[in-house]
């Protein structure tokens, strides 16, 4: 097993024999790969490539309340409470994209930004990478969500949002990770 600080090996024990686009739209490309598996057997692998970097914003006000947005998520056919999040296209910095998403979805602007971390959201089938921020020193404005977003906005105490990520009321991966990282950072103070 490679050491934690060793660079990854290209394709690791997998060998890609062919790659073709199975599906494509402005946001994702689905690749169909013919591969040789680690055990030497032939196989196939589907990979979802995301055009944009995902960003999420954990906005916390002076009363230690977290800003959540609620919306129906088409892929799950379920309603989801989550932090403001969205995609950052090439050419836009992650921080500028996070500022834009917070402003568009909620009308909120933040004076203070701290990067909380990065993660791969579903690395067995996707290359989607996410970056998340803590935003504070907030001022209110007017939201301008895009036509695909029918959003509700709610402020909840930080401790309640932490509980929601623990008991399954919040399942959005980016929200769970950002909230848990912020909670762990508070414990280590």
Regions found by a protein language model. Give the residues of each.
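Generic C-terminal helix-cap and adjacent flexible tail
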Residues: 184-189
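A glycine-rich, hydrophobic loop/mini-helix early in the fold
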Residues: 52-78, 82-85
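Unchanged
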Residues: 43-44, 51-56, 61, 87-174
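Short glycine/serine/proline-enriched coil/turn segments at secondary-structure junctions
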Residues: 25, 75, 123-125
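Acidic, metal-coordinating catalytic segment for phosphate/diphosphate chemistry
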Residues: 18-56, 62
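Hydrophobic residues on conserved beta-strands that form the core of alpha/beta folds
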Residues: 16, 30, 44-45, 69, ...
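Extreme N-terminal tail/first-helix region
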Residues: 1-24
């Amino acid at each position: 097993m490679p050491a934690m600080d060793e660079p990854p090996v290209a394709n690791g024990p997998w060998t890609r024999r062919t790659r073709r686009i199975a599906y494509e739209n402005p946001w994702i490309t689905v690749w169909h790969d013919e591969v040789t598996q680690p055990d030497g057997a032939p196989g196939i692998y589907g990979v979802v490539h995301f055009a944009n970097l995902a960003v999420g914003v954990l906005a916390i006000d002076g009363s230690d309340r977290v800003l959540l947005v609620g919306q129906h998520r088409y892929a799950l056919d379920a309603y989801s409470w989550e932090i403001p999040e969205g995609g950052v296209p090439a050419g836009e910095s992650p921080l500028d994209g996070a500022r834009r998403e917070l402003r568009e979805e909620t009308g909120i602007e933040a004076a203070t930004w701290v990067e909380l971390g990065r993660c791969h959201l579903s690395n067995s089938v996707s290359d989607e990478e996410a970056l998340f921020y803590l935003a504070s020193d907030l001022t209110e404005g007017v939201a301008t969500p895009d036509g695909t977003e029918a959003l509700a906005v709610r402020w909840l105490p930080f401790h309640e949002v932490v509980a929601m990520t623990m008991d399954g009321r919040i399942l959005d991966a980016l929200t769970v990770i950002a909230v848990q990282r912020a909670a762990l950072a508070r414990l280590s103070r």
